[in-house]
């Protein structure tokens, strides 16, 4: 059984697993002009932590390299895959789960865009101050990475 078929079975029918190389190529690199990359064998567009957990267990058991991807806005090559890689995209995990105004704490998913958190914070007289040039489309998960 191929890794793709086995991974799809492990994730279940509701998972978004992409294997078309014309599409996976767009998930294969960040904006580093010098870093080597190749389209991964598959991209999981994760919707929740359970899908990520299942994918990581599968990858670990099968010695498959994993690249986690936010928006691909980085300039270091850190989000670049090779042909044996599984890319886990966090683009759909983009919810602001809680804004605790009193304690100035936000609980967010990794795919939240910088500007979206800043906009939500401004509604309460607060701000999300990291201001990368890519703030219009870079994610908090990428900031943390």
Go through each PLM region and give its residues.
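Short glycine- and acidic-residue-rich catalytic loops of nucleotidyl-transferase/cyclase enzymes
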Residues: 69
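N-terminal glycine-rich flavin-associated loop
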Residues: 7, 34-66, 84, 90-133, ...
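Conserved phosphate/anionic-ligand binding catalytic regions in large, soluble enzymes, centered on
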Residues: 79, 143-144
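Short, acidic (Asp/Glu-rich) active-site segment that either coordinates a divalent metal cofactor
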Residues: 76-79, 86-89
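N-terminal accessory segments
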Residues: 1-32, 61-64
């Amino acid at each position: 059984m191929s890794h793709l078929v086995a991974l799809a079975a492990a994730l279940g029918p509701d998972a978004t697993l992409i294997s078309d190389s014309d599409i996976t190529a767009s998930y294969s690199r960040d904006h580093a002009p010098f870093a080597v990359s190749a389209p991964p064998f598959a991209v999981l567009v994760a919707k929740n932590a359970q899908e990520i957990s299942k994918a990581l267990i599968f990858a670990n058991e099968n010695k498959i390299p994993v690249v986690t991807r936010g928006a691909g806005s980085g300039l270091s090559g850190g989000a670049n895959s090779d042909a044996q890689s599984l890319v886990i995209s966090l683009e759909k995990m983009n919810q602001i789960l809680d804004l605790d105004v009193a304690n100035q704490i936000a609980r967010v998913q990794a795919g939240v865009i910088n500007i979206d958190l800043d906009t939500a914070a401004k509604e309460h007289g607060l701000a999300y101050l990291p201001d990368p040039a890519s703030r219009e489309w870079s994610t908090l998960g990428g900031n943390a990475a």
